[in-house]
Amino acid sequence: MATLERKLVEMLKAPVEALGHELWGLEYIQAGKHSILRLYIDNEKGIFIEDCAETSRQVSAVMDVEDPISTEYTLEVSSPGVDRPLFTAEQYQLYIGETVKVQVTMPVAGSRNLKGTVIGIEGQMLTLSVDGNELIIALDNIRKGNLIAKF
């Protein structure tokens, strides 16, 4: 996770939790002059559109005061959904035995895109079973990780 994203998580975690939600994670996507700040919120009851709207208003107020992003950006708030993104070691731990897709910065076993079963997590190292091979991947090397939904 980049330094700005860490700072944003620290800044926004308490306001989101005050509304009764968990800040599942966030993505800051720079797209030229206009960027996107995407927050994922969750709770045990599920997330409804009203929850997203209320969280958006609260987060906007905090962002206006703190002003951590100097360029224009669009704020998006949503639930993680069934193909939820995974950001932390704790989140990968929740999905041991499940299938995930990860994109890595530095190739692992010759690939930047991997799909496999979460075997375990130790510290900041994720173990995936990919095509029968166990691969160990540093969480810092994961650009993006998502749960693959079962239907």
Curated annotation (Swiss-Prot):
<keyword id="KW-0963">Cytoplasm</keyword>
<dbReference type="InterPro" id="IPR028989">
    <property type="entry name" value="RimP_N"/>
</dbReference>
<protein>
    <recommendedName>
        <fullName>Ribosome maturation factor RimP</fullName>
    </recommendedName>
</protein>
<dbReference type="GO" id="GO:0005829">
    <property type="term" value="C:cytosol"/>
</dbReference>
<dbReference type="GO" id="GO:0000028">
    <property type="term" value="P:ribosomal small subunit assembly"/>
</dbReference>
<dbReference type="InterPro" id="IPR003728">
    <property type="entry name" value="Ribosome_maturation_RimP"/>
</dbReference>
<comment type="function">
    <text>Required for maturation of 30S ribosomal subunits.</text>
</comment>
<dbReference type="InterPro" id="IPR035956">
    <property type="entry name" value="RimP_N_sf"/>
</dbReference>
<keyword id="KW-0690">Ribosome biogenesis</keyword>
<dbReference type="Pfam" id="PF17384">
    <property type="entry name" value="DUF150_C"/>
</dbReference>
<dbReference type="Pfam" id="PF02576">
    <property type="entry name" value="RimP_N"/>
</dbReference>
<dbReference type="GO" id="GO:0006412">
    <property type="term" value="P:translation"/>
</dbReference>
<comment type="similarity">
    <text>Belongs to the RimP family.</text>
</comment>
<dbReference type="InterPro" id="IPR028998">
    <property type="entry name" value="RimP_C"/>
</dbReference>
<dbReference type="InterPro" id="IPR036847">
    <property type="entry name" value="RimP_C_sf"/>
</dbReference>
